[in-house]
């Protein structure tokens, strides 16, 4: 058995002219980074995954997101798209059939599924 512990960072829209948060109701939070570690059955780290994601919906980093994460627009501007990073993340996760996904809280799972759905990507392995 393997465990994959992952964490997502996501961005949201911000209108500088109006100085307020704006969002796309289909995808209010856009994933801009996926980080993960893979553990064996004895909880030893056996692999890591980390990738920024180039924003397609909210191209500028929301001021609050930047303050909380330290991520700047320059960090993500040349990153691969979400579909590309998601494909690589699925490969990272899917090395064994009995892999357990672990995450801090339910927010990351909800937003991962919402981003997958927004881009119409397959979520079953």
Where do the language-model regions lie?
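Substrate-recognition/cap helix-loop segment adjacent to the acidic, metal-dependent catalytic center
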Residues: 107-125
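Conserved non-catalytic scaffold segment of RNase H-like nuclease domains
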Residues: 2-109
